[in-house]
Amino acid sequence: MHSGQNKKMTTVLELRNLTKKFAGDVTAVDNISMSVEGGEFVTLLGPSGCGKTTMLRMIGGFEYPDAGSVVLEGVDITDAPPYERPVNMMFQDYALFPHMTVESNIGYGLRISGIESRQVQHEVGEMLELIDLPGMQNRLPSELSNGQRQRVALARALIRKPKILLLDEPMSALDAKLRQSMQIELLSLHKKIGITFLMVTHDQTEAMVMSDRITVIRDGAIEQIGTPTELYDHPVTPYVAEFLGQSNMIPAVVQRSAADRLIAQVGSNELDVTNATIVGRIDNNVTLCIRPERIRLLESSSEVDTSLEVITGVVQQVLYSGNSLHFTISLDGNRSIHVHHPLNTVFN
């Protein structure tokens, strides 16, 4: 998880009841309201077609909402064209001009704004240092690696010092190893310059690693907003629990409850759990969310600590994944759960 900013932040962006429909009465964004604080790294996370990129495009001015408003630092920019908005967007395909050098690509926005050539060269040089590509100003995009092209696109988006940088799946074209490296570089850059970043991705790990806060989008609506820790440890719906990492969704029946705890019947077992474990409830029927890595395996012959909540089961399958073992455990009532254990902790 990104460390975020310690200083007091102020709201830089507000989306108020934002709605967008396309042909055939398809609702891409459904009455969404949210805010972003200055200096935050916020991610819009969801599967393809959930509306997250449409949200980003409405903030950038590339789409216009059917209802609602986009407010930047207290100013309504809903109907403003892209060139009048103090935001820049880094597109998924980078959109570099193939016939222009690195210097010309990065400095393009400054030149069309009428900035003198000497000043443009100076600022481009600073950007090349910032993105760790000094001396590459005369190269063409075709002479760069994929990661280098991404950095050039990033520098071009940042050189005009936008209030918000919009990132549309910025690492989707990179292989796994380069993607991890670029995540670290992007976070370092965000920390250096302090500009608000708003990123779209479908990659849960990427969102968890990079974000101060994550907005989970489902079918054009917000499912939950929170820090990576809040969303992982305290999902409010089964969808969030299962979208962010693997989860055991266990049906149970409430026997009794008090304060923030309850006794839940799972098959022939009773568990004392916190309300935060519940991700769905209808009357006394609840769904418990328990992460696979937070279950400890004990042999049936072991002496059990009475302070532990215990359910009995039978190991059905064991999979080796390098640094851990993944167990499938069958429970009463034709149910099963998954358990992940580091190699050196199994049955300890």
Model regions: which residues?
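Conserved coupling/switch loops of ABC nucleotide-binding domains, chiefly the family-specific signature
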Residues: 66-69, 119, 219, 251
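Helix-to-loop junction immediately C-terminal to a conserved catalytic motif
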Residues: 60
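ABC ATPase nucleotide-binding domains
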Residues: 41, 80-242
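The feature captures the beta-strand-to-loop junction immediately N-terminal to the Walker
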Residues: 45-47
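Non-catalytic connector elements of ABC transporters
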Residues: 247, 257-348
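Conserved ABC transporter NBD signature motif
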Residues: 68-76
